[in-house]
């Protein structure tokens, strides 16, 4: 309806550098001076110019991968230049019988980054698997930013969760796609490949994780979701995997993932581990860290490094900060979260 369309209309202004900001302030001051002189035609002219510059202000066209700081969860942003953006997972608090989500992770950790970078639309949202720490913020995200496509692996979801996803997609005019119908897609000069490495009839939803490889020029990025060693073994059997520039380490650095054979085959130059400070699971596992260190991979862990951005157009330059470490509390338990309870091995 009209209200929904209006609610989904977003306007994000990218963060300006200091010189642009100074010019903007001077221009606003000049407009007020013109108003005081009653030069209304010039006021209109300058107002149109400033608004046009704000709307068309060129954002950084570099291709970047960002591990968003969502605590004990996963959310990865890929910026493909020219406003071609993909989000992989939304983060979300772990839910069990004794612990409930206390605040909206996306409100304080994800949306501020998108707004700062002038991102008001996502071409794709890839949901790796139906665990709350990966998709728990879906409802909040899709109600605050326009999304064209959502990619899931249907077999990993219960009928109730699929029904809810279908309902939400219809409400926000998003195309819901099964990964088996897509297999790959191109976004500008970046290509996305989904590996067929699911473990049939597994009782572990982690083994239904969508594994994605992004290729840009000669750079390779591998995003593992919470895939297990079984998925890795299947990958090694079915595919001739290249060496990887950036690896999003599987399952937050748990010992259930990142086997010796797998890590030694792909030899990631940079390894990203998304895990919460002082998490009850003691992740990342020390053996996984040592395994990565032995191949001299540069390790970035959100516990110490916060949000991490890697510029694919600038020799894999890394920028890390603790952006989004909000301590505010806000009750935020969605229907989707209650359907996606998880436990860690």
What is the meaning of each model-derived region?
Residues 62-112, 121, 205-228:
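Conserved beta-strand hairpin/beta-sheet module of binuclear metal-dependent hydrolase folds
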Residues 69, 78, 89, 114, ...:
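Divalent metal-coordination and catalytic microenvironments
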Residues 85-89, 123-127, 149-152, 178, ...:
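Structural recognition of the beta-strand scaffold that forms the well-ordered cores
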Residues 106-113, 127-143, 196-284:
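Active-site-proximal loop/helix segments of hydrolase catalytic cores
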Residues 132-171, 176, 268:
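Active-site HxH/HxHxD metal-binding segment of metal-dependent hydrolases
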């Amino acid at each position: 309806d009209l209200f929904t369309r209006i609610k989904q209309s977003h306007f994000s202004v990218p963060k300006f550098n200091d010189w642009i900001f100074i010019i903007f302030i001077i221009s606003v001051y000049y407009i007020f001076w013109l108003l005081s002189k009653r030069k209304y035609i010039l006021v209109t002219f300058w107002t149109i110019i400033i608004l046009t510059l704000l709307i068309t202000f060129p954002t950084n066209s570099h291709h970047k991968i960002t591990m968003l700081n969502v605590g004990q969860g996963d959310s990865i942003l890929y910026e493909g230049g020219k406003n071609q953006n993909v989000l992989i997972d939304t983060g979300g608090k772990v839910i069990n019988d004794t612990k409930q989500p206390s605040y909206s992770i996306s409100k304080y950790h994800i949306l501020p980054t998108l707004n700062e970078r002038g991102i008001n639309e996502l071409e794709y949202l890839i949901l790796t698997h139906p665990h709350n720490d990966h998709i728990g913020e879906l409802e909040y995200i899709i109600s605050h930013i326009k999304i064209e496509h959502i990619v899931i692996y249907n077999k990993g979801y219960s009928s109730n969760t699929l029904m809810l996803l279908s309902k939400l997609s219809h409400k926000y005019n998003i195309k819901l796609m099964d990964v088996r119908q897509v297999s790959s897609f191109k976004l500008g000069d970046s290509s996305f490949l989904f590996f067929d490495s699911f473990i049939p009839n597994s009782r572990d939803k982690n083994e239904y994780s969508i594994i994605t490889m992004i290729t840009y020029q000669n750079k390779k990025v591998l995003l593992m979701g919470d895939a297990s060693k079984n998925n890795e073994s299947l990958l090694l059997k079915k595919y001739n995997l290249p060496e990887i520039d950036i690896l999003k380490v599987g399952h937050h650095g748990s010992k259930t993932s990142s086997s010796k054979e797998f890590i030694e085959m792909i030899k990631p130059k940079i390894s990203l581990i998304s895990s919460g400070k002082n998490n009850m699971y003691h992740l990342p596992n020390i053996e996984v860290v040592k395994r990565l260190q032995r191949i001299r991979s540069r390790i970035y862990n959100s516990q110490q490094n916060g949000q991490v951005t890697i510029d694919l157009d600038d020799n894999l330059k890394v920028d890390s900060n603790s952006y989004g470490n909000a301590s505010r509390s806000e009750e935020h338990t969605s229907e989707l979260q209650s359907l996606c309870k998880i436990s860690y091995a």
